[in-house]
Amino acid sequence: MAEITASLVKELRDRTGAGMMECKKALVEANGDIELAIDNMRKSGQAKAAKKAGRVAAEGVILARVENGFGVLVEMNCETDFVAKDAGFLGLANEVADFAAANKGTTIEALQAQFEEKRAALVAKIGENMNIRRVAYLDGQVIAQYLHGAKIGVLVAGEGSDDELKKVAMHVAASKPEFVNPEDVSAEVVEHERQIQIDIAINSGKPKEIAEKMVEGRMKKFTGEVSLTGQAFVMDPSVSVGDFLKSVNTSVSNFIRLEVGEGIEKKEEDFAAEVAKITGGNA
């Protein structure tokens, strides 16, 4: 039996909005598998669509470079927001971004090796760990970029107006689509959601045959919600992004979205533990 920690229960609660006891029970039944617990809670009606995993806990910056139909995003992490604003840290991050832009296709491993000496020297000087975490490249006829406070970076590739594609990049930053078009949603993702929706309908008392028919409409809504062109446009929710693009004679072929610290969790201590640590006592 997997250990059900308080932090795991809290994460499930944050992602589902369900009560603490319901979350703990679901985790016990799923043997600590949070994704399985979410699926089971959705099937039983205890939770609706869950928030995506990947609480942002690390600090750092996202930098972008765009030129002549080519763009690159680089993420560099550190431990505190204070260091994320340090001139030395930002200087190194900009060097990395410039190098990645000038050497298209450089892998993250190659980037890390290229700047390891400078990184180690800066760590020794500042006294805080830092690392070059991710690099992502995008090609296209037109590349638009959007940076939200150096914490979220988006590149959008397409054809048409750069100004209109930048609006779409802002939408991607806010709405986090996973695919470009509804038809791009992978068969595996669609089938997983379909089975959940069928179980939800059956658990509500519907016969299996009727449940399966009901699900088709729900699946169309689901693929629209997770795809860029199917989402309601943040700047005008009365139209979809797809309709907006058609109205301005612009199209999107691909996009990349990076957010500082996605998928990284810092070690957290409760307040009592922090006090005990400071005073040398026990919590």
From Swiss-Prot:
Its main location: cytoplasm. PROSITE patterns: EF_TS_1, EF_TS_2. Signal peptide: none annotated. Keywords: Cytoplasm, Elongation factor, Protein biosynthesis. Pfam families: EF_TS. It is found in: Cytoplasm. Residues 80-83 are annotated as: Involved in Mg(2+) ion dislocation from EF-Tu. GO terms for molecular function: translation elongation factor activity. InterPro entries: EF-Ts_dimer_sf, Transl_elong_EFTs/EF1B, Transl_elong_EFTs/EF1B_dimer, Transl_elong_Ts_CS, UBA-like_sf. GO terms for cellular component: cytoplasm. Gene3D superfamilies: 1.10.286.20, DNA helicase RuvA subunit, C-terminal domain, Elongation factor Ts, dimerisation domain. Belongs to the EF-Ts family. Associates with the EF-Tu.GDP complex and induces the exchange of GDP to GTP. It remains bound to the aminoacyl-tRNA.EF-Tu.GTP complex up to the GTP hydrolysis stage on the ribosome. This is Elongation factor Ts. The gene is tsf.
